[in-house]
Amino acid sequence: MGQIIDGEKLAKEIQERVTTEVAELAKIDKKPGLAVVLVGDNQASRTYVRNKQKRTEEAGMKSVLIELPETVSEEKLLEVVEELNTDDTIHGILVQLPLPKHISEEKVIDTISYDKDVDGFHPVNVGNLFIGKDSFVPCTPAGIIELIKSTGTQIEGKRAVVIGRSNIVGKPVAQLLLNENATVTIAHSRTKNLPEVAKEADILVVATGLAKFVKKEYIKPGAIVIDVGMDRDENNKLCGDVDFDDVIEEAGFITPVPGGVGPMTITMLLANTLKAAKRIWKMN
């Protein structure tokens, strides 16, 4: 029977460390600032942004929300980003995705100053991650590595399989595992004999977007299973990409949904914002 990795508890511990450091900086009149740009009225995005704001303020950081209508021009949005790039009170900039179809996400990400790119999506930060240089790492992959390490497992020398190859989770988490000296396979919808490939993993990260996709025949006994999914099952109940009840019998450690990877994402955003501020102040 697998042990549950408590993402809520770990996220709280990391947030407490960030909050303590922010309080120390306040004593020398320094305050990290995070700006979030929200375009349109997507309810899921709005809820997520509200959570980010609340957690930013709880950590003692400056929190700025800029709301723009769905019809805003790409040019206007890029102007807003450029203004934030030159604002000395803002150290992290995040444009909430997805954006309306008439706006190029790529152009927006490229416009964010890479030293304020706390989402870790700018090509410079992506490149630095892939050559093993210190960079801003996308928040979910960064959180996943912390979750794996919290089990006391040494990643070096382990066999890791990542199911999913998105630029936001799959590819960066695979690279982070490689940087930790794991032997990494990236699997996806075209991978042949997927259960057999997955079953070789000491560490299995699942980011398919398919509810309860991974069953126990995918699991090597004792493996660490990280479920990145946020889906709904046939009863409209929140679930992950892993069939938790089926897999927990085989896994050594497993993240639940909710309460696993999710809470870590915003916490790592705060850690990235603190890191950005310290870099800009040349305090690293």
UniProtKB/Swiss-Prot annotation:
One of its GO terms (cellular component) is cytosol. The keyword Oxidoreductase applies. One of its GO terms (molecular function) is methylenetetrahydrofolate dehydrogenase (NADP+) activity. NADP(+) binds at residues 164-166, 189. Transmembrane segments: none annotated. It catalyses: (6R)-5,10-methylene-5,6,7,8-tetrahydrofolate + NADP(+) = (6R)-5,10-methenyltetrahydrofolate + NADPH; (6R)-5,10-methenyltetrahydrofolate + H2O = (6R)-10-formyltetrahydrofolate + H(+). Disulfide bonds: none annotated. The keyword Nucleotide-binding does not apply. InterPro entries: Aminoacid_DH-like_N_sf, NAD(P)-bd_dom_sf, THF_DH/CycHdrlase, THF_DH/CycHdrlase_cat_dom, THF_DH/CycHdrlase_CS, THF_DH/CycHdrlase_NAD-bd_dom. One of its GO terms (biological process) is L-histidine biosynthetic process. Keywords: Amino-acid biosynthesis, Histidine biosynthesis, Hydrolase, Methionine biosynthesis, Multifunctional enzyme, NADP, One-carbon metabolism, Oxidoreductase, Purine biosynthesis. Pfam families: THF_DHG_CYH, THF_DHG_CYH_C. NCBIfam families: PRK10792.1, PRK14170.1, PRK14186.1, PRK14188.1. Homodimer. Belongs to the tetrahydrofolate dehydrogenase/cyclohydrolase family. This is Bifunctional protein FolD. The gene is folD.
